[in-house]
Amino acid sequence: MNDAPGNGADFVREGKLDTQVLIVGAGPVGLTLANDLGRRGVRCTIIEQKEAPQFLPKMERCNARSMEIFRRMGLADKIRAAGLRGDVPMDVFVILAMDRPPLLHLPYPSVDQARAEVAASEDGSMPLEPYQLISQYTLEPLLKAEAEKLSSVTVRYGCEFISAAQDEGGVNATVRTLDGKTETIRAAYMVGCDGGASPVRKQLGIKLRGEGNLMRLSQALFRCDDLFDRIPIGAGPGKGRHYHVADDKATFLIMQDSTRHFTLHSVVESDEEMKQRFEVVVATPLDYEMLSCAEWRQNLLLADNYRHGRIFLAGDSAHLVIPTGGLGMNTGVGDAVDLSWKLAAVLQGWGGQNLLKSYEVERRQIGDRNVGASRYASGGRRKWRSQYRPEIGKDSPAGEAARDNLAAVADLEQRKTNEMIGAELGYRYVGSPVIWEEPGGPEHLFRTYEPTTWSGAR
């Protein structure tokens, strides 16, 4: 199929297209794509089956590379203002409970401290923007509001993707609105940003391959207004971001972006058991409300293809990772901005025939790399958790030995999750049809970043 239909704006004006790009799925990836296309003057429509953004804590951190991208879009300061305040420590703990001395304390800089380090660095070894703790239920409405400000972007919630057919000139997508009526939207290109269960990917017959259903956990969102202010509780750990519980249920507590909301992950059989786990971990009487509880599965999967004709995949529709390392949504943001400028170039007449071909070449290798990075990180956490022994909480020589052993292993292995700057910044596009290829090149590691001017690197 021809990549270049001419000037897409002319097609819209002539009535041949309803929109230049149809985006299916208004999560953070789809909304990032809509915002970037809109800022480039590309007419796009983004549809979402849900009636409104949901209050669900699917992600909780924009990494350094995503914040650099949002800075370029003029959104970084708005995201920081909406997220966790900059003075809160990002420390990580391994604990028995919140009222007992931590087994391990891994200190990490707050956003304010990280920004000061960035400002003081002049050798290119630091990102332009450090990370920002912000939950998806905060980020999504922010990106939606920004997209709605752009005259070239149409945002439609309560609009479900049903099917699509493509021809030489575009894509005809059938959608269904809340009242049950169907309509056809014609676009030059379509992008499926519709999550791991992606109806777009399934219709295209593109398979996900890798390791699926590795583990089942439940995730609950709690509101507890007093917990953050009460920390430290007795001899317990100080204020931080993650509290990993040394138990046989893979339990960990995460502070979300308001200091009043926390998520708890654990292997449980019921909502009531999840409440009990929260009380055991917090270990002090506090008023709380469990706002949601749902099961999720750990997957390490990659789509065979990121494109079929005029239809593309981005985000979780193309790759699924375990949240360890924070490479899910953040990888999708990279997909969105790589595809955005290429679609704009072709639609506006200054991009050549090979430009859109480069999207899959470039981004699928990063998806594959980040699936590997997630495997590396989750393997580290699995390794230290395997050191759990039932006597670990006992005041006895055997209990002390169990605590010391687990802490020593966690001190090595938990860092694989929390120190991933190389995976965030150090990737390089190899074999792209639009990048000059040189043999060799630097080796990029997951945990460390070395700045380079090698072609295809950040």
What role is predicted for each listed range?
Residues 17-19, 179-189:
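Core beta-strand elements of the Rossmann-like FAD/NAD(P) dinucleotide-binding domain
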Residues 38-59:
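Glycine-rich FAD pyrophosphate-binding loop
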Residues 25-34, 143, 192, 290-376:
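Conserved mid-domain beta->alpha element of the FAD-binding
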Residues 1-22, 36-40:
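Extreme N-terminal leader/targeting segments of oxidoreductases
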Residues 157-171:
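A conserved short coil-to-beta-strand element within the FAD-binding core of flavoproteins
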Residues 344-457:
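C-terminal helical "tail/cap" subdomain of flavin- and related membrane-associated enzymes
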Residues 55-58, 62-146, 245-246, 256:
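Active-site-adjacent segment of FAD-dependent monooxygenases/related oxidoreductases
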Residues 145, 189, 193-300:
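Conserved FAD-binding catalytic core of PHBH/FMO-like flavoproteins
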